[in-house]
Amino acid sequence: MLNYNAPTDGQKSSIDGANSDQMQTFFWLKKAIITARKEQYFMPLASVTNMPKHYGKTIKVYEYVPLLDDRNINDQGIDASGATIVNGNLYGSSKDIGNITSKLPLLTENGGRVNRVGFTRIAREGSIHKFGFFYEFTQESIDFDSDDGLMEHLSRELMNGATQITEAVLQKDLLAAAGTVLYAGAATSDATITGEGSTPSVVSYKNLMRLDQILTENRTPTQTTIITGSRMIDTKVIGATRVMYVGSELVPELKAMKDLFGNKAFIETQHYADAGTIMNGEVGSIDKFRIIQVPEMLHWAGAGAQATGANPGYRTSMVSGQEHYDVYPMLVVGDDSFTSIGFQTDGKSLKFTVMTKMPGKETADRNDPYGETGFSSIKWYYGILVKRPERLALIKTVAPL
């Protein structure tokens, strides 16, 4: 009887002689396993400001500070009695009834040179930078590779890589530009963030309430506009809430959070949202914040305090031979807080320029006289203009293992 035995297991079939073997020992599943493209979370938050030609690489914009604002610092102030005062902003941002009453711009019957105020403007600016990378391939890599869709896969991954780089750079810039920063626990800086002691740097419900209060005082809208659609031409407005971005490491901590009454603070999306209002990556809400889980969320490895054997189970990294706590951000992006800067764009998304030259006459030169090597490159311009840094907010905390 003729039997088949698997050659890959080291046993020949009965028909194969000493110098013979099966030619096909596996079935090739032609459709390659493609790593899922990392989704975008931050790029859809802003439109793109187009940098025109012949104006350099920097965009500037003025922000005019309101009259009644502590940031309106000027030397033009004259009060109701005619005396020169330090700041010409009347009572500024004060909410004290006594202070407001004493600085009201009252006029007498004769008027006079009183109640002079001044104004302040702040210049914001951002610059664009050029990014790019390429890969090379030979004619034989195309002709003889077992995957006849090789070039298609490589072209797709080229574009995906550029998109992911842009997403990471934008996230880095948003974290660095945050004008409102809170530290969990008793910490007052990155270097004092710890998971130990009686007041560890673990985010609490009170931290979220405090952050919402500060953002409200900063006039941050409780709605967020997100660019959607396959061509990035549609928008979706998320109202009456603020959007908070966190890494996967913090989600267990948030799900275990208790409110001021000892009840579960975290509400899963299935309890309040439908398919039309849920955002990409949204996992739930706490107080006024809708929580977006970002798998590629950045953090500061080893930027916290030195860890000891008393670490109850929070993430650390080795720095100069010592374990230090990792610092994890919880990022809130207020509406219209920033804009991306591009060059020759459509005003909705960054424009990528791809150039491909196949092996042959196009690539033949003194370095490759036979024209056996081709290449594909991608380049783009990127920049960010932070218009209202006070609407970008962070809570810095430790994260459990």
Swiss-Prot record:
Its main location: virion. GO terms for cellular component: viral capsid. It comes from the Viruses. The keyword Phosphoprotein does not apply. The keyword Cell cycle does not apply. Pfam families: Phage_capsid_4 (PF25209). It is found in: Virion. Keywords: Capsid protein, Virion. Assembles, to form an icosahedral capsid with a T=9 symmetry, about 60 nm in diameter, and consisting of 535 capsid proteins. This is Major capsid protein. It comes from Enterobacteria phage N4 (Bacteriophage N4).
